[in-house]
Amino acid sequence: MSTTTTQIQPKPIPALYTVYILRSQPRHASLYIGSTPHPPRRLSQHNGLAKGGAYRTSKISLRPWNMVCLVSGFPSMIAALKFEWALNNPHKSLHIPAEKRAEAVKGLGRRKTGHLKRPRKSLVGVMEALRMLVGVRSFGRWPLRVHFFEEDVWRVWERGGWKAKSGGGGVGELGDLKVEVVTDFGSPTAPQGAGVIGMGEEAENDPHDDDDGDDAQDENKHGIYALPLDYAPIKDYVAKSQEIWEFERQGSCVVCKEAMVAGRGLYAICPNTSCEAVGHLDCWSRCLLKQETRRMKIDEGDEILPVKGECPKCHGEVLWGDMMKELTLRIRGQAEVEKLLKKKKRRRAAKGKEKGKGKVADEKGNNAEGRNTKGNREVKTTPQRVVEDSEDSEFLDIACLQ
């Protein structure tokens, strides 16, 4: 009897994967925590405007729901699900200190199964758990960013001691670890008509119901609608990387100075626009970790992966998360790369058509003006044939690594 096994193909670091917090607009005490790569679509599902959603958000009396806060920057769906579970279960998560877990379950009984009852969610409690989770070592070195879309929720966060700088964004700090805090109170985060169409399909949080949707097209680009849902923010970085390998400009490793052969190793590239520094992955890691040990005054060898540092060539800041997103996209994300290139190609084709139409119009005008008479004969001048130049399409080979 033969058995077949399905091999799971590794994926690039996603363009966006978030853990979000919903709050009921009619009843602010009702909160919901979930994860998604597409916040606008997921919010529509929770509000009954699209199929999907979750059983706990299906009550009409609690709709519409507002997405008041989210955390972005997770390197994979699994990473986001782990963080989501810990935020939903701070009384069980080993990422939370034991004394804090004891406080959370103090006075609560047990279920018939013997398990501790889950403490009731409150905004203060969720913010406290969120602060602890983004600060622990298991999550604190990820390129996470905390977004706030309601001012009162941000105020609760501030009272906890992680104050953002003025100007709508900033960095909260806990010891040597930092998290970027972004505020955007420009518009409501619940779509109009929420809860009117119906309950949709009731489904518990399914990690697969959010994948690969079209970008949200909303005229009001605030809040969750302003989040980048694809790899467009690193398109120039990806294009630079492709050109380096296509024209064999990688040269020697920026750290160890050894020659690099395409296709025979994992090579990372400086993300700064004017810099083409390329190096072995382990060389970049050692270089940036040494900088961290000096800057943060920690013992060498305590960490495995860096967070950020300075490029040895251009001396600009490099973020490890950005470098790994480009690397994994170059190695594992052929489909995503082609999607990026198609958008670029369509824009070029549209410009070419407009250019061609202009040339044809000029040709017709010249043809009309080119008719003259010589004696009693009409002489027609033959217009020069217009040949529209075609631009060579670029090809980007991109991949990713975790």
From Swiss-Prot:
EC class name: hydrolase
GO MF term list: 5'-flap endonuclease activity; crossover junction DNA endonuclease activity; zinc ion binding
The protein's Enzyme Commission number: 3.1.-.-
Segments of skewed composition (Acidic residues): 201-217
An annotated GO BP: double-strand break repair via homologous recombination
Keywords assigned: DNA damage, DNA recombination, DNA repair, Endonuclease, Hydrolase, Metal-binding, Nuclease, Nucleus, Zinc, Zinc-finger
Cellular compartment(s): Nucleus
Cofactors (names): a divalent metal cation
Entry annotated with the keyword Nucleus: yes
Domain GIY-YIG: 15-97
Main location (coarse class): nucleus
InterPro entries: GIY-YIG_endonuc, GIY-YIG_endonuc_sf, Slx1, SLX1_C, SLX1_endonuclease, Znf_RING/FYVE/PHD
Pfam family of the protein (one): GIY-YIG
Membrane-spanning residues: none
Zn finger (SLX1-type) location: 253-314
Subunit note: Forms a heterodimer with slx4.
Function of the protein: Catalytic subunit of the slx1-slx4 structure-specific endonuclease that resolves DNA secondary structures generated during DNA repair and recombination. Has endonuclease activity towards branched DNA substrates, introducing single-strand cuts in duplex DNA close to junctions with ss-DNA.
HAMAP family: Endonuc_su_Slx1
Homology family: Belongs to the SLX1 family.
Protein name according to UniProt: Structure-specific endonuclease subunit slx1
Organism: Neurospora crassa (strain ATCC 24698 / 74-OR23-1A / CBS 708.71 / DSM 1257 / FGSC 987)
